[in-house]
Amino acid sequence: MGSMPTDVETLSMYEAPDDLTREIDEHIRNSALAQSLRANPDFIESRPHLKIPAEVRHHNLTAGTLAGPGMIAVPPYYFNEKDGKSMVQIFYVGLDCSGHPGIVHGGFLATMLDEGLARCAFPAMPNKVGVTANLQINYVRPTMAGQYLVLRAKTTKVDGRKAWAEGWIESLEVAEGEEPQKLVEATALFVEPKHAKVS
């Protein structure tokens, strides 16, 4: 396995396999939200799924197993605020992530929140790594499949090897004049393993 790509390099690594996927990718990349975050110097844009080496990526749940047509159609775009203060993720969820027909499975949403809150909190931790100790989720309203979603997270507290984060998922697209509504929200506690310290 070679060296890990930089955040900037991940932005040009993805090649859409077909026109529909290319359209989804361009829609996210050119969305007003992505453009405003990209213009903010406090945020770093990346596509972390593409940092995982291709030869092992298919073993990763969100970058491999759940990635592809009908699921997480394209590698999500992440915008991390420096020092782990907050994070915004934009992604598309397809119809094959449904529990009931057309409604995204709650376990899928829990997985995305677990990973998203972790990616927000880890940079604030001493050695930038941790494991989920607690994840509490409130499902506010049904999340329809086949749409663009936004995951927003913020680190609320850091105490030694522990970091707390909270966040939610909302729709990217909203009617003119309306605010996005929370679809599902979560709080989490992450703990850095004792052996995580690198000498």
Task: Describe the function of each predicted region.
Residues 1, 8-12, 117-150:
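Hydrophobic beta-strand-centered segment that forms part of the acyl-chain substrate-binding groove
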Residues 1-53, 143-145, 154-199:
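HotDog/MaoC-like acyl-thioester-processing domains
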Residues 47-70:
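Flexible, low-complexity linker/boundary loops enriched in proline and small hydrophobic residues
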Residues 62-104:
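Catalytic strand-loop segment that frames the active site of acyl-thioester-processing enzymes
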Residues 73, 84-88, 134, 148-150, ...:
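Intrinsic-disorder/low-complexity, polar/charged segments enriched in Ser/Thr/Lys/Arg/Asp/Glu/Gln
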Residues 92-94, 140, 191-193:
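Structured beta-strand/turn binding interfaces of compact recognition modules in eukaryotic regulators
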Residues 103, 109-113:
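Mid-length scaffold segments of soluble, non-membrane domains
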Residues 113, 135, 151-153, 167:
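Structural signal for hydrophobic/aromatic residues that build the beta-strand cores
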